[in-house]
């Protein structure tokens, strides 16, 4: 029998162990506060997780989960849900929670695109009281509030944020810093005033100045980057170069000794292809006189014939499919001609171009049929003419081998195979959009300057896209109108696919610039417009939001069921909201539209009117110019007066058809772009002052054109700025 004293001793020894077990078991039933790791950013989850934790918690822990849920909803783009949850925050918050609340308030304003309000909230936040991850978010909010516009506050925010980041986020910060610097003009840079102790910023500005001085010379730019890294070894950009400058260091110029020009030379699109060909050859060969017309007389005269679509009324991007080849199509590539056949002499009534003291861009002979094509030769008396003043000059090169391939006579894959077999070093073209789509599917390794854009641009290291399209012009219009401080644009477009494409392109660019909703109003035929004038109805400055400009509202999910967000009010009245109207119309259409706007809204409506080059065809008489008083419209620099000699040559060769003259200028610029293909592809900020616009390239190597803007003023046409 075990003694009783032993049992008592054993029991007394076991009691503390049992009590401890009970205590620990009790602790296990209450989950530890997990919010700290999430608040500090070391742990992350989606809004659903945070909302669930919030519903199961209380007091400060519940508030922490609520703050985390708001942040997650913002990151997921669910702005309205984030606002609703933010408004439910309790009044009593501790210091840490209040700091997070202040930061979220600014982030919410940015998500709602209320940038001035966001800046005011950010200015009231003490950054020293924030945790490191909150400081990174704070500076990101400051960056976002600047809307990508290069400025001193933006640069300072990026520099302050950089030490708080690592890995890919740090590289993104450095790339964004360089993007801001490289998008400045020298004048903007010189206007910056910095403090003496801002050493990092001073280093960045010295890099920017070196880039300004050498961006047109890749060799000098490479040497300048190396020298800058030596002088500023501690600068973040010296330790981790911006991606664009890494590409500069790897720069290798592409050969343009053997060029393949891919164009439709038969069918409906032939008039476009031959005009571009003539402009391209003009720049290549350095000839100084127009030897003939790029298009048959009947095509150029179509603008004056009723019920016939003139080339001036058709956009190149509208020609999305090749036409059936006519008799005598080119089945083989032809060599660029120098003399026209006897059967293609210019009619007697065609005016010869006036002589210019210094032709700005050389002019080539016209295209010929395959049967009469002769090898390219250059006579000794043909001197290269002077080129337009540009950031990077492009000289004529008659010795370069040029072969022209007809994309309307055979499938594109066969054309590309022949081009590859012929050993071309660069391809210029194709022109038709469907051919560009086929080009993307081919995965060719050749360097290609496509003369149109596919629906979905793909970033290919060997492809650049150069389009002369209404969408391209609409994007430039969005930038111009935004630069003029306008905030609420209305688009007046044809009731057609063209009008919808223009509206989408404008709205997408407007969104990227930080703009709000874009309105669109569609108009019908000329007869409908005439009836509107006769009826005295006028045009109200109202419209429906373009879908591409609407913020994506997230639905609400309750119990597994997603309820769509309520629709946005489709009709928004002018009432002082619309401050700009962009009109895409022919001269005849705009002659009705502008008076109808004044009829309905008065001449002092305060709305600035803008128009595309579609309304400018060189036929504006004094009455038309007076009627259009105050209207701004875009035009390529050549037709805006920057290159009078080339303008005269181009218009003479296409019988004064302004749309074809623009394509002629496109051919001239295509030669310049082909000669600077690698620079456009690899050197950040590389720019050509072309005849179709100031040419720069996006990261996808889509060539942007900054157009000239003109204005009707008291019967005269003057620069808009």
From Swiss-Prot:
GO biological process per UniProt: peptidoglycan biosynthetic process; regulation of cell shape
InterPro entries in the cross-refs: LpoA, Peripla_BP_I, TPR-like_helical_dom_sf
Bilayer disposition of the protein: Lipid-anchor
Region (Disordered) residue spans: 316-393
Segment forming the signal sequence: 1-26
GO cellular component: periplasmic side of cell outer membrane
GO molecular function: enzyme regulator activity
Keyword Membrane: yes
Biased composition, class Polar residues, residue ranges: 316-330
Lipid attachment in record (S-diacylglycerol cysteine): 27
Keywords: Cell outer membrane, Cell shape, Lipoprotein, Membrane, Palmitate, Peptidoglycan synthesis, Signal
Gene3D superfamilies assigned to the protein according to its UniProt record, in alphabetical order: 1.25.40.650, 3.40.50.2300, Tetratricopeptide repeat domain
Compartmental location: Cell outer membrane
Lipidated sites in chain (N-palmitoyl cysteine): 27
Biased composition, class Low complexity, residue ranges: 331-393
Family in the record: Belongs to the LpoA family.
Protein task: Regulator of peptidoglycan synthesis that is essential for the function of penicillin-binding protein 1A (PBP1a).
Self-association and partners: Interacts with PBP1a.
Stated name of the protein: Penicillin-binding protein activator LpoA
């Amino acid at each position: 029998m075990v003694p009783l004293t032993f049992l008592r001793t054993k029991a007394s020894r076991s009691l503390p162990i049992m009590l401890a077990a009970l205590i620990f078991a009790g602790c296990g039933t209450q989950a530890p506060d997990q919010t700290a790791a999430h608040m500090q950013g070391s742990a992350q989850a989606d809004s659903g997780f945070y909302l669930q934790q919030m519903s199961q918690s209380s007091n400060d822990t519940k508030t922490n989960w609520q703050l985390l849920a708001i942040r997650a909803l913002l990151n997921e783009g669910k702005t309205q849900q984030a606002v609703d949850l933010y408004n439910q925050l309790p009044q009593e918050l501790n210091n840490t929670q209040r700091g997070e609340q202040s930061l979220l308030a600014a982030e919410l304003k940015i998500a709602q695109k209320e940038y001035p309000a966001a800046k005011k909230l950010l200015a009231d936040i003490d950054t020293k009281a924030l945790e490191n991850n909150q400081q990174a978010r704070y500076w990101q909010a400051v960056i976002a509030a600047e809307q990508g516009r290069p400025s001193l506050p933006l640069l300072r925010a990026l520099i302050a944020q950089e030490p708080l980041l690592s890995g890919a986020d740090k590289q993104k910060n450095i790339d964004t810093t360089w993007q801001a610097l490289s998008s400045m003009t020298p004048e903007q840079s010189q206007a910056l005033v910095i403090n003496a102790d801002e050493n990092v910023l001073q280093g960045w500005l010295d890099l920017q100045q070196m880039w300004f001085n050498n961006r047109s010379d890749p060799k000098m730019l490479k040497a300048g980057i190396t020298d800058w890294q030596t002088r500023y070894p501690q600068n973040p950009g010296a330790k981790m170069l911006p991606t664009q400058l890494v590409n500069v260091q790897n720069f290798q110029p592409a050969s343009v000794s053997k060029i393949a020009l891919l164009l439709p030379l038969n069918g409906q699109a032939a008039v476009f292809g031959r005009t571009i060909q003539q402009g391209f050859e003009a720049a290549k060969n350095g000839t100084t006189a127009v030897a003939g017309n790029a298009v048959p007389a009947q095509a150029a005269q179509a603008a004056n014939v009723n019920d016939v679509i003139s080339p001036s009324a058709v956009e190149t991007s509208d020609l999305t499919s090749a036409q059936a080849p006519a008799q005598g199509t080119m089945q083989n590539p032809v060599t660029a001609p120098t003399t026209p056949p006897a059967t293609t002499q210019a009619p007697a009534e065609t005016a010869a171009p006036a002589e210019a003291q210094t032709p700005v861009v050389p002019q080539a002979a016209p295209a010929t049929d395959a049967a009469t094509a002769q090898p390219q030769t250059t006579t000794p008396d043909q001197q290269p003419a002077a080129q337009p003043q540009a950031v990077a000059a492009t000289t004529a090169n008659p010795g370069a081998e040029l072969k022209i391939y007809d994309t309307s006579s055979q499938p594109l894959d066969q054309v590309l195979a022949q081009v590859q077999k012929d050993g071309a070093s660069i391809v210029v073209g194709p022109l038709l959009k469907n051919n560009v789509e086929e080009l993307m599917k081919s995965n060719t390794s050749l360097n290609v300057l496509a003369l149109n854009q596919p629906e979905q641009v793909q970033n290919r290291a060997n492809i650049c896209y150069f389009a002369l399209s209404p969408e391209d012009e609409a994007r430039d219009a969005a930038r111009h109108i935004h630069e003029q401080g306008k905030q609420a644009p209305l688009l007046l477009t044809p009731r057609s696919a063209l009008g919808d494409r223009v509206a989408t392109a404008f709205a997408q660019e407007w969104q990227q610039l930080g703009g709000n909703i874009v309105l669109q109003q569609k108009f019908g035929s000329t007869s409908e417009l005439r009836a509107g004038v006769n009826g005295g109805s006028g045009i109200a400055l109202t419209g429906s939001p373009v879908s591409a400009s609407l913020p994506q509202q997230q639905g609400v999910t309750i119990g597994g069921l997603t309820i769509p967000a309520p629709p946005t009010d489709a009709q928004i009245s002018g009432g002082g909201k619309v401050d700009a109207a962009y009109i895409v119309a022919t001269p005849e259409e705009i002659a009705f539209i502008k008076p109808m706007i004044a009829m309905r809204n008065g001449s002092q409506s305060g709305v600035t009117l803008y128009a595309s080059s579609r309304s400018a065809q060189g036929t504006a008489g004094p009455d038309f110019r007076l009627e259009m008083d105050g209207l701004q419209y875009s035009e390529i620099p050549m037709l805006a007066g920057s290159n009078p000699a080339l303008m005269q040559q181009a218009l003479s060769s296409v019988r004064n058809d302004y749309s074809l003259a623009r394509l002629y200028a496109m051919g001239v610029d295509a030669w310049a772009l082909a000669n600077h293909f690698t620079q456009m592809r690899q050197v950040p900020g590389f720019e050509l002052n072309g005849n179709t616009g100031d040419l720069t390239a996006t990261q996808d190597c889509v060539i942007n054109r900054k157009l000239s803007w003109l204005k009707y003023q008291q019967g005269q046409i003057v620069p808009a700025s």
